[in-house]
Amino acid sequence: GNWNSVFWKIDPTEEQAQTLADTVRDALDGDLPKATPVAPPAATLDDYCTVYPLTDAHIGMLSQPEETGTEWGTTLAEQTIMRWMTCSLELTKPSTYAVLAEIGDLLHFDSLDAVTPTNKNPLDADTCYQVMLRVGLRVVRGLIRLMLTKHRYVHVVLAEGNHDESTSAALREFIAVHYEDEPRVTVDQSGTGFYAYRHGDVSLFFHHGHKVKPAEIGPVFASRFREDYGNTRRSYAHLGHLHHVEVKGTNLMKVEQHPTLAAMDAYAA
């Protein structure tokens, strides 16, 4: 369905991310190889929309069993994410519409230095920034390609996270340009950190969870996306950030916090 973004005051972090996104888009415009078309499925169910939530993948993170009890790295992250999508597609209906809801922190760090963007806390990384970005782009393109074999239309949300505030903007712009000639793919290019999608009388909202807590997110979405919220009967909010599952019903919408596929890092352990 149709959806509209309500842009309010942009804080300095959001403004910097949008500036980076504009730079990437201008640099790539007209020169980026476009996606090769994927044959659409023979038959799909028009009344259904399938949402595939992925959050806190932390591609580029290093986790060693000796220190954390679990293992994670760039190669393992890519393999795990692609297996997750393959298994998910086998279990879902062939709906006409689908949403790839990547809810933030796809990448573990946001610059040449492996530190958190805001507080500059050191992070355990197993690769350099360029390789991490390359793998992240390959993963997103791979997920979309798989989804196009099952669903006729795919809407892509690549949410800002607290680990990849700026790079997530570059990812959105890159993927949008890459698929601009593919009418079966749409990309949410909002730079606010809050995202919405409408299917029939259902509104779906997405935010990483680093700026607004789950208990407080309902009014934020309802006010930012007045038309979507006001013209749908059921609303669902999807968040990540805290790496574990929590589902709450509020007076405004159902709020679900999704778990991570990634292992713990040294800080969490």
What is each of the regions a protein language model found here?
Residues 65-95, 137-145:
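Divalent metal-dependent phosphoesterase catalytic cores across multiple superfamilies
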